[in-house]
Amino acid sequence: MVPVTWYLWLAAMLFTIGLSGVLLKRNALIVMMSVELMLNAANLTFLAFARQTGDVGGHAIAFFVIAVAAAEAAVGLAVVIAIYRTRGTVNIDEVRALHE
């Protein structure tokens, strides 16, 4: 049996990679993928604690987060496609500069 701390370290690394992608990248698609990675890290944490305690609440929360992430990805991708069609770019800095 794998200790829970290994799952937590993996989740922390995934969350850190996702956070660095959100903070450092300027492409809207990369930022969206980084947010999804952060949500998956949170799911892994919920599932690790649910496995340790034997409670099914962590599994229920993980399914809810997956549903919210799917909706967020669909809406976010639609927004990115609309921005690309109108502006011709998905670079966050250029879109923000055009807004001002």
Curated annotation (Swiss-Prot):
Q: Which UniProt keywords apply?
A: Cell inner membrane, Cell membrane, Membrane, NAD, Quinone, Translocase, Transmembrane, Transmembrane helix, Transport, Ubiquinone
Where, per UniProt, does this protein localize? Cell inner membrane
Membrane protein topology class: Multi-pass membrane protein
GO MF terms here are: NADH:ubiquinone reductase (non-electrogenic) activity; quinone binding
Pfam assignment, any one: Oxidored_q2
Q: Which InterPro entries match?
A: NADH_UbQ_OxRdtase_chain4L/K, NUOK/Mnh_C1-like
Bilayer-spanning residue ranges? 4-24, 29-49, 61-81
Q: What is its EC number?
A: 7.1.1.-
What's its top-level EC category? translocase
Q: What is the first-listed, main subcellular location in coarse terms?
A: membrane
The record's catalysed reaction(s) read:
a quinone + NADH + 5 H(+)(in) = a quinol + NAD(+) + 4 H(+)(out)
Entry similarity comment: Belongs to the complex I subunit 4L family.
Q: What does this protein do?
A: NDH-1 shuttles electrons from NADH, via FMN and iron-sulfur (Fe-S) centers, to quinones in the respiratory chain. The immediate electron acceptor for the enzyme in this species is believed to be ubiquinone. Couples the redox reaction to proton translocation (for every two electrons transferred, four hydrogen ions are translocated across the cytoplasmic membrane), and thus conserves the redox energy in a proton gradient.
Q: Which PANTHER family match?
A: NADH DEHYDROGENASE SUBUNIT 4L-RELATED, NADH-UBIQUINONE OXIDOREDUCTASE SUBUNIT ND4L
Q: What is this protein called?
A: NADH-quinone oxidoreductase subunit K
Highest classification ranks of the organism: Bacteria, Pseudomonadati, Myxococcota, Myxococcia, Myxococcales
